[in-house]
């Protein structure tokens, strides 16, 4: 029996990483928000790897934080090891990665959600959407409760018609043995949503006491811990190690002899998995020339003996997993606590979404996370944050908040999804960003915090921290330009760091341009340095000065990019009626309905000649609107 259970501004369906960010963003912007999840015990659950960040993904976490999201803050509270990756390369690809304590990550996020004003958390399974005139009006739960709202955000993760595979065994399930959602996907299909089937997988968890760490290589965290959140200065914490080992020829033999029992190789699963996170079967088959593969043994938390076997995702039968693990160096006595599995699930074709993450043909219905075809906690959180923001802005009748490819990795992520779509679970990488020297993780607050404050999400305290850092950077760069040092003073330091000597006085600014000279090195000859300058500002000053020419070049490229992005395409355009457009271009443009000429140019199947036709059409349209004048 259905009953009216209440009215809200925004309803969020799902409490994974996308759902948490969506609900918190909506509530913090003043919207009366309801968050529904199938179980309160799975909030911000990490069903796969126990880490946050990494190459490309760390950039997303920093951007989420700069906008006012929670992932960075929660990771800083709960990490057990932290490392900055790619430090031997340029700053554009430096990426922070932290091992999180899974249980603490969940409990801390749950606590944050429970204590957030304007946000109500309830356990319930959503089985239907309330739709009137192609507009969502609310949701219906399995118990018959009808919750009404202005906007609904779907953040259902891998639960829609979830099915787990372990060798020849398969059964309907969500991740980690939780209940799947079996009804909502069918409803979405009836509403005209083009749903597809993706898959992902996770390795076994083994008992810590069954691992021989003496045969493995210890990997420690960084001594100087860099926080994810711009709200944190420095963090001191005792860290735990991870361990590196390798597969053996015997491992590969066990896999190949049982390949026909793998759910994927048996043909039981026809869905598409993540390209950049292949199963161990895939790695052994595709890279048969490699004698071994790296395996990392990672702790799941401080209060558990479970260890995550990174690099051994599989859908082989449990007894084969056991035999396979025992052939890995140091795992000869390994005891499985949770078997590895593959999981299939339904998700939406993201080209059906607007850049705001609103479903094009269902007004006020937004979505985020793996439901949109991505993989990874960070990609999910980024989308959830943007969906939450835009759901509130639409409720208020305000302009949407859309980041383009030159402003954020979040912009790259969403633009790729809604413009190009994806035929496999999408993963963020630094190589996807054209302007990565501008979109560094260290300057995410410089790029995004002020924008977020203007829409009512970033707090005043966050804005003030950003403004202080900004002033420190500006003042320090000015001071470095004005401060000259003599050859007598500078040359001993330059010689010590194998940099060419100077014959006349030179500014600290010009000295810092040299690759061998760091901001830290200059301290020895820089008596007037402001000791209170924040660490982040010091790092930014050095990057801005060292890469000045490259940054200026990229900014010029962005100016050209913006010219096409700023040419808006009216949504009422009939592309089938534009002479000169190729048939494929007409179909693709009609389906995706790009917001700008720039977005249109990135659609697969739209050629440069089609863009030229569009530009001519827009100019003709402008002249007609102006009465035929120029």
Swiss-Prot record:
Homodimer. Heterotetramer of two MnmE and two MnmG subunits. Its cofactor is FAD. It comes from Alkaliphilus metalliredigens (strain QYMF). SUPFAM superfamilies: FAD/NAD(P)-binding domain. NAD-binding protein involved in the addition of a carboxymethylaminomethyl (cmnm) group at the wobble position (U34) of certain tRNAs, forming tRNA-cmnm(5)s(2)U34. PROSITE patterns: GIDA_1. One of its GO terms (molecular function) is flavin adenine dinucleotide binding. Keywords: Cytoplasm, FAD, Flavoprotein, NAD, tRNA processing. The gene is mnmG. Belongs to the MnmG family. Its main location: cytoplasm. It is found in: Cytoplasm. This is tRNA uridine 5-carboxymethylaminomethyl modification enzyme MnmG. NAD(+) binds at residues 273-287. FAD binds at residues 14-19, 126, 181, 370. InterPro entries: FAD/NAD-bd_sf (IPR036188), GIDA_C_N (IPR049312), MnmG (IPR004416), MnmG-rel (IPR002218), MnmG-rel_CS (IPR020595), MnmG_C (IPR026904), MnmG_C_subdom (IPR047001), MnmG_C_subdom_sf (IPR044920). One of its GO terms (cellular component) is cytosol.
């Amino acid at each position: 029996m259905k009953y009216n259970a209440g009215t809200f501004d925004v309803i969020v369906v799902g409490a994974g990483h996308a759902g948490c960010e969506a609900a918190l963003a909506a509530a913090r912007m003043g919207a009366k928000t309801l968050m529904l999840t199938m179980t309160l015990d799975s909030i911000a659950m990490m069903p796969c790897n126990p880490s946050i960040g990494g190459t490309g993904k760390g950039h997303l976490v920093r951007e989420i934080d700069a906008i006012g999201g929670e992932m960075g803050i929660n990771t800083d509270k709960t990490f057990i090891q932290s490392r900055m990756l790619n430090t031997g390369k340029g700053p554009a690809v430096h990426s922070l990665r932290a091992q999180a304590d899974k249980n603490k990550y969940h409990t801390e996020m749950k606590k944050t959600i429970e204590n957030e004003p304007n946000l109500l958390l309830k356990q319930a399974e959503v089985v239907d959407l309330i739709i009137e005139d192609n507009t969502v009006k609310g949701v219906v739960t399995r118990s018959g409760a009808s919750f009404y709202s202005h906007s609904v955000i779907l953040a259902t993760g891998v639960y829609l018609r979830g099915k787990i595979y372990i060798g020849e065994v398969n059964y309907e399930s969500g991740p980690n043995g939780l209940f799947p959602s079996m009804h909502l996907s069918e409803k979405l299909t009836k509403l005209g949503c083009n749903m597809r089937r993706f898959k992902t997988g996770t390795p076994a968890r083994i008992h810590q006491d069954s691992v021989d760490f003496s045969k493995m290589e210890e990997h420690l965290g960084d001594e100087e811990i860099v926080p994810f959140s711009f709200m944190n200065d420095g963090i001191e914490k005792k860290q735990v190690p991870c361990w590196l080992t390798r597969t053996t020829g015997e491992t590969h033999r066990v896999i190949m002899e049982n390949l026909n029992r793998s759910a994927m190789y048996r043909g039981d699963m026809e869905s598409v998995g993540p390209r950049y996170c292949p199963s161990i079967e895939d790695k052994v088959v595709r890279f048969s020339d490699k004698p071994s593969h790296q395996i990392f043994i990672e702790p799941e938390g401080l209060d558990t003996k479970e260890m995550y076997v990174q690099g051994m995702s599989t859908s082989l039968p449990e007894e084969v997993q056991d035999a396979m693990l025992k052939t890995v160096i140091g795992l000869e006595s390994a005891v499985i606590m949770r078997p590895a599995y593959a999981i299939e699930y339904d998700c939406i074709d993201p080209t059906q979404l607007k850049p705001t993450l609103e479903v094009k043909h269902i007004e006020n219905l937004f979505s985020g996370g793996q439901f949109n075809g991505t993989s990874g906690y960070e990609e999910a959180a980024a989308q959830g944050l943007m969906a939450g923001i835009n759901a509130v802005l639409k409720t208020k009748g305000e302009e949407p908040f859309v980041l383009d490819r030159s402003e954020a990795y979040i912009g790259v992520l969403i633009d790729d999804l809604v413009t190009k779509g994806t035929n496999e679970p999408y993963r963020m990488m630094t190589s996807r960003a054209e302007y990565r020297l501008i979109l560094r993780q260290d300057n995410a607050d410089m790029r995004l915090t002020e924008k977020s404050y203007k829409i009512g999400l970033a707090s005043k305290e966050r804005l003030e921290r950003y403004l202080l850092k900004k002033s420190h950077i500006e003042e320090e760069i000015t001071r470095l330009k004005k401060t000259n040092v003599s050859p007598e003073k500078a040359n001993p330091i330059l010689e010590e760091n194998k940099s060419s000597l100077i014959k006349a006085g030179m500014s600290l600014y010009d000295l810092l341009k040299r690759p061998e000279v760091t901001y830290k090195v200059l301290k020895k000859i820089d008596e007037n340095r402001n000791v209170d300058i924040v660490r982040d500002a010091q790092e930014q000053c050095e990057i801005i000065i060292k890469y000045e020419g490259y940054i200026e070049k990229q900014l010029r490229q962005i100016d050209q990019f913006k010219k096409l992005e700023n040419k808006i395409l009216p949504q009422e355009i009939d592309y089938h009626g534009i002479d000169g457009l190729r048939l494929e271009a007409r179909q693709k443009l009609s389906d995706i309905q790009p917001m700008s000429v720039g977005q249109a140019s990135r659609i697969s199947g739209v050629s440069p000649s089609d863009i030229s036709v569009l530009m001519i059409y827009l100019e003709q349209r402008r002249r007609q609107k102006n009465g035929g004048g120029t």
